[in-house]
Amino acid sequence: MQVWCTNRVRNYETSDPDALFNLSVHTSVPYFVDYANPDDQQFVRQYRALYHTEPEDFAFQGHDVIAYFVSRMMQQGSAFTDQADLYPMQLLHCNFHFKRDNEKSGWRNRATRNLVYDKEDFSIAITK
């Protein structure tokens, strides 16, 4: 049995963090920094060296937005928006996978990160 819950449960003042781990809760979140990931660790080290402080969520988001859109524009030019669904990307803080509801609608990022609270070692892992 898997227990899935909204990502808001992580921020409830009344929720017991131990319960999330004991139940091996699964949740989907739009953003998550995996500090065990070497790429995330390198970003944090470089950010600390440059700004002498810890990166906040906006630093990771800014990195990911620039990395995604600049790389797409460099490879496809302005036409990258014609086939944005063909280029999903996993980055430091978030993933990008654009979809359209129909041909006349704009693109929406439908990517999430699925997290699992591991009761064995009290870690949070990103799953595919």
Which functions belong to the PLM regions below?
Residues 1-128:
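Extracytosolic ligand-binding ectodomains
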